[in-house]
Amino acid sequence: MKIDKITLCNLTSIEGEQTIDFTEEPLRSAGLFAITGDVGSGKSTILDAICLALYNRAPRFDNVERIPADDLKLVTDKAQQVQATNTASILRRGQKQGWVSVTFTTTKGHTYEATWSVRVKRSGTIASPERQLTQLAPEHQVVDKAQLQACIDEAVGLTYEQFTRTVILAQNSFANFLRAKQADKAALLEKLTGTEVYSAVSERIFRLAQQAEANVAALQSAMQ
């Protein structure tokens, strides 16, 4: 999967609509680049937004405690407390709506646009985030919501856990991959390098060898 474009609007420290287009210069021809800035300028927000669009989950919401709404980026005073794991808390303070759109192309050449959005209802409370997945090429069609996450998982080729251990590593999370169990680490590497086929072949050969040995043993027993 290759990310083509990211558009964010009113998410934490990112105010208004901002776009990062990897299909346009200077990023198009850049082999390697860095996103830099002061603490709190929105670098991690970009990574979180990508995860929200693809999985409705993000590293900043993992393993955190309940905290007062005022300490989150909420725009309402009516919600006394929310779960810090609630992805809606990424909405920038003072704004009525925020969203992210990620356009990406799969290894099969199919192009999709995944969007995630959140808004404030008339009552002043935060509405549940909304998601949409649209296939842009080779055909233009909106993916049924019931199939949305399964379609993204298949298109990306990674689950959220795998994605955040290999493609996007949150702050202080590089050790997650290193701490992974050997079997999990091997499975991840196989999936990323496309070599899982060799494990399947190896298992097939092993089963055939076992069957052949059993047949030989049966024949030897019959001849005695």
Range-by-range predicted roles:
Residues 1-150, 154, 160-162:
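Extreme N-terminal "head/tail" segments of very large remodeling/mechanoenzyme assemblies
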